[in-house]
């Protein structure tokens, strides 16, 4: 039995990763920062480890005896108090955890798996069927969250030599969906208050990955991936943005009468810059409701290719689109 240390275990995707690992014979130690998380993690069969992503001593103790580390925890634009907080939790914490794991004299970790985002290649234009070899755009073109992931990826891959004792593997995920998604519940609330708009009509296409498929692919990657491998994981076929969100909203009981409002893209772009300026001038807490990242996701094609994972890892879908919708 191999021991896995997991960050972000009490989050939406983290819970699916725990289920996938435990059902396949792994013992999971999951980072926890509260008694509430302790209870959730314990109920799922994981062993909670009280510490913080910024506690070097605590993390050093947490990974002792672990063969694999999966770093899934991340701060999103929607739940960050500031850009500085987002960068601290996503960049600084990643570098700290990686450096602790990479200490050959004290660490038993042989695989470091970083859960990243397709957004690291988001350049503001339509992107269709992008592979893992697609180059990063200039860093200033990326939104805050995607920039934090791109910086972390580049640090990990540049630091880790091909001859290193520890394998570093990067998983790039598109929009992750499935049951138990609190973000979907929040969006449903916006719909019911007539606050949901289709930017540009919502006719763009995107890649998605169900949390069950993502967690399965992550397990395959830690078992079969090589050092410095990057893998895209998707549900296969891309889906139109408007159809995907409408299907989910309807499953949650949202009336189609509340899903007809359209916001022209030029107006949405103006709002992004106006909001950013207001937040900066008045030093408002949190990040703007509409950001550059959100605008691009909502209005541009963004599809990625996961042939590498399917060919090298034997990755396939454990659940299809209709089955996933039926579970909502």
From Swiss-Prot:
The active site is at residue 145. It is a single-pass membrane protein. GO terms for biological process: cholesterol biosynthetic process. GO terms for molecular function: 3-beta-hydroxysteroid dehydrogenase (NAD+)/C4-decarboxylase activity; dTDP-glucose 4,6-dehydratase activity. It comes from the Eukaryota. NAD(+) binds at residue 149. Its EC number is 1.1.1.170. Homodimer. This is Sterol-4-alpha-carboxylate 3-dehydrogenase, decarboxylating. It comes from Dictyostelium discoideum.
């Amino acid at each position: 039995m191999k021991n896995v240390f997991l960050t972000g275990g009490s989050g939406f995707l983290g819970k699916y990763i725990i289920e996938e690992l435990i059902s396949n014979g792994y013992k999971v130690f999951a980072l926890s920062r509260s008694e509430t998380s302790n209870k959730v993690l314990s109920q799922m069969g994981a062993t909670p480890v009280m510490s913080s992503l910024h506690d070097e001593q605590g993390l050093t103790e947490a990974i002792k005896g672990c063969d694999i580390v999966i770093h899934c925890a991340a701060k999103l634009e929607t739940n960050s108090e500031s850009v500085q907080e987002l960068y601290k939790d996503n960049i600084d914490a990643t570098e700290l955890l990686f450096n602790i794991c990479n200490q050959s004299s004290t660490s038993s970790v042989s695989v470091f798996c970083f859960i990243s985002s397709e957004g690291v290649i988001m350049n503001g234009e339509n992107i269709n069927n992008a592979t893992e070899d697609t180059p990063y755009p200039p860093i200033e073109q990326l939104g805050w969250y995607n920039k934090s992931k791109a910086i972390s990826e580049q640090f990990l891959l540049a630091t880790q030599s091909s001859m290193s004792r520890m394998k570093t593997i990067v998983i790039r995920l598109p929009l992750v969906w499935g049951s138990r998604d609190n973000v979907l519940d929040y969006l449903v609330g916006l719909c019911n208050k007539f606050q949901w708009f289709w930017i540009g009509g919502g006719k763009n296409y995107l890649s998605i990955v169900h949390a069950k498929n993502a967690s399965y692919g992550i397990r395959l990657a830690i078992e079969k991936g090589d050092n410095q491998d990057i893998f895209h994981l998707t549900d296969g076929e891309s889906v139109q943005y408007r159809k995907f969100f409408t299907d989910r909203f309807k499953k949650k009981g949202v009336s189609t009468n509340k899903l007809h409002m359209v916001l022209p893209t030029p107006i949405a772009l103006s709002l992004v810059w106006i909001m950013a300026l207001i937040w900066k001038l008045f030093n408002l807490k949190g990040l703007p409701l509409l950001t550059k990242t959100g605008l691009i996701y909502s209005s541009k094609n963004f599809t990625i290719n996961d042939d590498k994972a399917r060919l090298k890892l034997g990755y396939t879908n454990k659940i299809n689109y209709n089955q996933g919708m039926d579970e909502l």
